[in-house]
């Protein structure tokens, strides 16, 4: 492992600290911890609770030391980013890889997956640096060669290459000035076309089936593949779990791609509970087939635990809690890409670059997953005269998402889709009914 840099957040800026200051900081933290651990005695339970809350202040300063394998330490050499930011990107890619694919038998494929994630991370907050339409050379990587290093010899090689290029195309547009163009406008409108289309587009946006395929490849399980219906259910579980937990993170980002920006918010807890239960049932049904544990492991870790284990999230900064509503400070830090987050603020700009859009549609077999071009053409101008569509997308205010605002009638149809999830899951995976009493 390679230690890269130790940094601390002071006034929303990263600075490098010396070992001596690091030691001083640890001593200070120890002193604070001792004072916080003193018992609070008060006969009035309300006063006691208030005192306990006051004794646990928000973490204002947190130090991180980034670790990652030497295999990726010299990547991004020619890319104009600060060294400390590169260190954070490498560590984020390593932590994500270890969380969502905890087991591996093929190190070379594993490293290729890390590099895929490095490219994806940069696309998410520095979209102007990534243009998959212009070149196969991205950020110093040969994209096709990296995808081949991960998937060559697997049944999903070509399909997953298109999946990842779609992710890069849309994600980089969203995180750059290109989001004011025709492609991203039509893309966000199409997200709200139907719940099934939404989950397929969110699947790609989250690299969900892509990571399932990567987990199989990194464990040399080249003989396993899923049907389209099976991929849809597996990724719907993962995306629903993740988006339920990341609800406030996504609002802080003004996100267009979050399940509960469209699904009724009051179903968030119920949806999480049902998806978690089905995941445990599927895990038990597949228990005698250890090869499939790689699939379950991804969905399980992606669906929640990464929010505690990865330093990309605010679990430590928010006193070991998950699910805190975003504050103005969090939103402001998101604009500054703290923790590699990215804020999509609304603006009045709209670029009618239909020529670029048409050129991309013509290249859809290379740059879009199967079916996306049809989604964009059919739903790109909106399909409901009551939903609120815009010329350019992003959050207009704090505590808002950045996408289409569904009307009450459309929300009702989306509610019905989510409420029949268990029935849909058991139809695709009948072993759920064979082995367990799953209510339908």
UniProtKB/Swiss-Prot annotation:
Enzymatic class: lyase
Keyword RNA-binding: no
Family assignment from sequence similarity: Belongs to the alpha-ionylideneethane synthase family.
Deletion phenotype: Impairs the production of abscisic acid (ABA).
One of the record's GO molecular function terms: lyase activity
Name under which the protein is recorded: Alpha-ionylideneethane synthase aba3
Organism lineage string: Eukaryota, Fungi, Dikarya, Ascomycota, Pezizomycotina
Keyword Cytoplasm in record: no
Keywords, in A-Z order: Lyase, Virulence
UniProt induction comment: Expression is enhanced at 60 and 90 minutes after the addition of the ABA precursor mevalonic acid (MVA) to the medium, but declined after 120 min.
GO biological process: abscisic acid biosynthetic process
Pathway: Hormone biosynthesis
Physiological role: Alpha-ionylideneethane synthase; part of the gene cluster that mediates the biosynthesis of abscisic acid (ABA), a phytohormone that acts antagonistically toward salicylic acid (SA), jasmonic acid (JA) and ethylene (ETH) signaling, to impede plant defense responses. The first step of the pathway catalyzes the reaction from farnesyl diphosphate to alpha-ionylideneethane performed by the alpha-ionylideneethane synthase aba3 via a three-step reaction mechanism involving 2 neutral intermediates, beta-farnesene and allofarnesene.
EC numbers, comma separated: 4.2.3.-
Top-level lineage group: Eukaryota
